[in-house]
Amino acid sequence: MNEYYEPTLLFRQNAVKKYSPELSPVSSMSSLDLPKSNNSSSSWLLDNHNPKDTEILNKSCSLNRLNIKSNYWKIPDNDMSLTSMALSRQGDSNKSLLGISSANDDSNLFIYELDLAENYLTHNNTISLPNVHAMRWVPQMGNNELSLITGNSKGYAHLVSIPNSNEEGQSAEIVKRFNHRKHLKSINKDPSIASHTSTDITKLNFMDKSMDLLSLYDNNLFLWDINGCDSQVRPKPISISSIPGIVNFDPIPHSSNSVGICGQFGVSLFDTRQPKFSVPSSVMKQANKRKLGANVIRWSPNDDNVFAASHMDGVIRLWDIRKQDYFASLDGHQGKKIISIEWNKNDLFSGGRDGNIVHWDLTSDINEYPKPDITNCGLKEGLNSIKFNPVKNSVEKTINQRQCGTVLPASNTNIVDMCSVSLTSHNEEDVKVLSIDSSSFLGLHSKIFDAVKVNINSEKTYYTDDDISLLLAAQQSSLSTLVNDSTENVTKPLTISRMPTTKITHDVAPPAIPTPASVVPTTPNMSNDTLAEGPDEFVEVGDIIRLKEPKFSFSNYNDSVFSVDSNHDIKSSPSSTTSRGSFGESSSSISTNPTIVEASPISHKRDPSDIFNFKTDFDFGLGLNDYKFDESLVDRSFDRMLSLKTNATNYYSVYSS
């Protein structure tokens, strides 16, 4: 018997240990090799070679889905209060003008040029137009003029003329001003702000193939004629419809009079030629009982009879106007409120307050009629996508459920707005969608089946030196993300990649990506937001930039002028040697020079400690009480790390699934 205490060697099935006296007590403990005949009785163990076991693990942990590529840019909005976005295609090319608005008082309207094919973002202008909550690009009817409609928080919509990027010395100008509050008297409503439930213009859109503008203000739907407003000193709406409980609308494609509306009453069709609208009390009771009140509605671009609507229970339902009920429901946000819905061909994207964007693949059966009997569509990955039978050790399918949703974790906070993108490409599978979130990130998400072209066999059990070199080559970074017209400064975006998961049996981890110690990030100034000379007098510039009205014998708000100064002072990355061709003939920076500058340039430098400083509730309905923020997250390693290197920093990440 030993003179010292020795713990008892416990016996457990499949974990038998043996002791060798000639070795130390630690090194002498080794596992006994189990006979192959005993493997049949160990069904509770995870077997990597068992398709049933790997199917459950891969499906629940999202390990077997396709690659999805995402690019991210940081928008220089100090208060992180982005409200809306709008995209305007430039002819048949893959370049588009992108407008992003904020609820701030100044420097809150950002104009970018986006190259959809190469994923480049070029900053053009920054404009001060206070408290923008909705906007829409005006359709170009055979001219090259760029105009933007914006709606603010005080019931005013502005028609703004945006200078082209190649026009130097030009200023942005407010062409017309549409006063919504003043015209409420015509429908016997009090125009005072105190009597309104909301003073924000929450939605702007144009009727299909026309210049008729629809705007939503305080449960009222306004219809304006943009073409006819030039001859009016004070534009008047064509019609005003009071619709209690209305939240959103969407014009029907290929129709000049019909609009789909949604709200507390559910979903409905509306004819602009009949401005009177009433909801029966029985319909309201049924909508509240079934939780069919809706906040977003979008018509299918390929079928004028089908539309999608997000409802109060966090479920998207597909409706056919030839039926009195929905024919499919899409549940993928776990009851969270859905903020935006976008169609792209027959694909549907939804973004919610959970920070996820769900891609719904409806290509196979959306065009069939009568519609397939699919009453429930769910996610094809994640814990909610599987039903496990422990007796049969197999995955069971839910009856009448079609799993067609793919989750993209796009944001750590919540999605604010989305915009669908169509590429001019021969590849019909090129599907992209833009998003902005409450952390002031702009995301470009691509449905690409070969997002990372790295020829690594997924069945390998180790990385070779060539594989590691190839992985590191795909993770080369660049300090510069915005590009200008100079051939010397065109660089690829900053990239942060996460490769497809492979099994590694060796203890040696792949080497970390070296970071140059000599690189010092700099923050160039944004456009020097200034105000220009008005038609009758100079505009005074104080600490807060505002538009000053010209003095006439009558009160006219249609001639206010302001300017922007575009600064493309973007430097090349010292750590990247790749270059591309220029976007234009000129190698000089694009700029618009103001007439009078009475204020110092506005710098958008920000302190890292203020990145997640939520000072107040957002005016567009995303308050601090809607989610909790952990300050310790600032020190963690995000897939989309915040950067102060440029005015709008680009991130590239691959969600391997």
Swiss-Prot record:
Ranges for the WD repeats: 77-122, 127-170, 196-234, 287-329, 332-370
Gene coding for it: DSE1
GO annotation (BP), single: cell wall organization
Cell cycle found in the keyword field: yes
Any one Pfam family match given in the protein's UniProt record, by short name: WD40
Keyword Transcription appears in the UniProt entry: no
Paired cysteines (S-S): none
Top-rank taxon, per record: Eukaryota
Keyword field: Cell cycle, Cell division, Cell wall biogenesis/degradation, Repeat, WD repeat
Protein name (Swiss-Prot/TrEMBL): Protein DSE1
Transmembrane segments: none
Species the sequence originates in: Debaryomyces hansenii (strain ATCC 36239 / CBS 767 / BCRC 21394 / JCM 1990 / NBRC 0083 / IGC 2968) (Yeast)
Family as reported in the entry's similarity comment: Belongs to the WD repeat DSE1 family.
Role of this protein: Involved in cell wall metabolism and required for the separation of the mother and daughter cells.
InterPro entries associated with the record: WD40/YVTN_repeat-like_dom_sf, WD40_repeat_dom_sf, WD40_rpt, WD_repeat_RBAP46/RBAP48/MSI1
Low complexity bias locations: 572-592
